[in-house]
């Protein structure tokens, strides 16, 4: 059975659309701008919205895992405990957060900067 070019292209487009789904997921900057996520004082991202979808959870977990690996390495180089380094980075990240985006206060509440 021969597939004509049109059917092959349709099949290819369908396959690529299934593979490319993560490309359409929201970015960190978009999620911050929309008020879905924000910076916490511990150096990690947190989810602001009460009902996050799976893509948002995956985004935050992926970024936080990368941050943790970087913090472990940097804390070791600096000769400090990881939690000390995390707190320093958390403060820097919150300080750099633009107006209109969220930061988590020490009392656990989210505040729009």
Task: Identify what each model region corresponds to.
Residues 15, 20-22:
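N-terminal signal peptide c-region/cleavage motif recognized by signal peptidases
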Residues 26-62, 78, 82-113:
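Amphipathic, charged alpha-helical segments and their helix-to-coil junctions
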Residues 4, 22-29:
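N-terminal leader/targeting segments
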Residues 2-12:
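Bacterial N-terminal signal peptides that target proteins for export
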Residues 10-15, 27:
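General structural signal for secondary-structure boundaries
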Residues 60-75:
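Short, well-ordered alpha-helical segments
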């Amino acid at each position: 059975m021969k597939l004509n070019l049109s059917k092959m292209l349709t099949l290819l487009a369908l396959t690529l659309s299934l593979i490319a789904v993560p490309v359409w997921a929201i970015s960190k900057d978009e999620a911050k701008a929309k008020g879905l996520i924000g910076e916490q004082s511990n150096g990690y991202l947190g989810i602001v919205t009460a009902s996050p979808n799976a893509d948002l959870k995956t985004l935050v977990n992926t970024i936080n895992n990368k941050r943790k690996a970087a913090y472990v390495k940097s804390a070791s180089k600096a000769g400090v405990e990881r939690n000390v380094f995390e707190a320093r980075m958390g403060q820097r990240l919150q300080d750099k957060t633009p107006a209109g985006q969220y930061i988590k206060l020490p009392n656990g509440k989210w505040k729009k900067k």
